[in-house]
UniProtKB/Swiss-Prot annotation:
GO terms for biological process: cilium assembly; protein transport. It comes from the Eukaryota. It comes from Homo sapiens (Human). This is ELMO domain-containing protein 1. GO terms for molecular function: GTPase activator activity. Residues 133-314 form the ELMO domain.
Length: 334
């Protein structure tokens, strides 16, 4: 009974707040002579702040036209803007900038949805060793990361040198499908210097000094074992696939809207997503070294802490993950 009453109160509060919000919108329109979309465009600077407010306004509207506008085909955006202006009785000759601002926002909103679909398609496509294109991408990954070391054979223990778990990398792509390979190749090709440096660090990590306090807790045998385990390296390719999973979840959850709406003046593309992966890979490597973990068994703890830090950064509406490496030179700031 208590649960039912609690649910009933929550439902009543929801509709009450919704009613008050509609009343406020009506009063604001009468006072300013502008609809909510106009007020947002005129009072909010371009970027994530404006686009996310426009997106919320369109989705929460009682108008079917406005609700469906966030999922129209990119080619239909211009016509959709005209229909919205007509519905809101806004003269485009008197308010020419409004149409331009709304179009920019819709391009980002629709583009983000389409980007999720593109990324999901790659994630669902399994690596196929009988597919020449898949094989070519994998071999290119080796060449970009190990340009001076020829691969002796397709099935080889050499793959472990770039962080795969066995002698055939295809089994490591099961979780993220082709998306993991696409991201790794992009990083290795577009930011070769940084990728090779990260790989080198992962293979030849700095040693972690054990403090006297830590030594006192171990027996001689335990200390000798700990002394041998204190390196902080990791498997480059496996971590890259794991960071791909992180980037994917940030995208699908909507957390990356802040970043993409601030750096992509129109529709965010797969290249923007791959550049974001490069940034995350670069930052995670620095974060891993700063955290100074005892061994690879602490990976999940460090990754979760890193994820929370990125999410906190993305909660800032002005946030754009900094393009400070070669792969992101093409990013355009708004």
């Amino acid at each position: 009974m208590k649960h039912f009453l609690r649910m009933l109160i929550q439902v009543c509060l929801y509709f009450y707040c919704k009613f008050l919000w509609r009343c406020l919108k009506f009063v604001m329109r009468k006072l300013t002579g502008r609809c909510e979309l106009q007020r947002i465009c005129y009072n909010t600077k371009p970027g994530a702040s404006r686009t996310m407010k426009i997106e919320t306004s369109l989705r929460d509207s009682k108008s079917k036209l406005l609700q469906t506008s966030v999922s129209v085909h990119p080619d239909a955006i211009e016509k959709t803007i005209e229909d919205i202006m007509e519905l809101k009785k806004i003269n485009p000759d008197v308010n020419p900038q409004l149409g331009i601002s709304l179009q920019a926002c819709l391009l980002q909103i629709v583009g983000y949805r389409n980007l999720i679909a593109d990324v999901e398609k790659l994630r669902r496509e399994a690596y196929d060793s009988d597919n020449p294109q898949h094989e070519e991408m994998l071999l290119k990954l080796w060449k970009f990361l190990k340009p001076n070391t020829p691969l002796e054979s397709r099935i080889s223990k050499q793959w472990c040198e770039i962080g795969f778990q066995g002698d055939d990398p295809k089994t490591d792509f099961r979780g993220m499908g082709l998306l993991g390979l696409y991201n790794l190749q992009y990083f290795a090709e577009r930011d070769a210097t940084a990728a090779q440096q990260v790989l080198s660090d992962s293979l030849h990590p700095k040693c972690r000094d054990i403090t006297k306090e830590e030594i006192s807790k171990f027996s001689k045998a335990e200390w000798e074992k700990k002394r041998m385990d204190k390196a902080i390296g990791y498997s480059f390719a496996i971590v890259g696939i794991n960071i791909t999973d992180l980037a994917y979840n940030l995208l699908v959850s909507g957390a990356l809207k802040t970043h993409f709406y601030n750096i992509a003046p129109e529709a965010p593309t797969l290249s923007h997503f791959q550049q974001t992966f490069c940034y995350l890979m670069h930052e995670f490597h620095k974060f891993w070294i700063e955290e100074d973990p005892m061994d690879i068994m602490e990976f999940n703890r460090v990754r979760e802490k890193f994820r929370k830090r990125i999410i906190k950064q993305l909660q800032n509406p002005d946030m754009a993950l900094c393009p400070h490496f070669a792969a992101s030179e093409g990013l355009i700031n708004m």
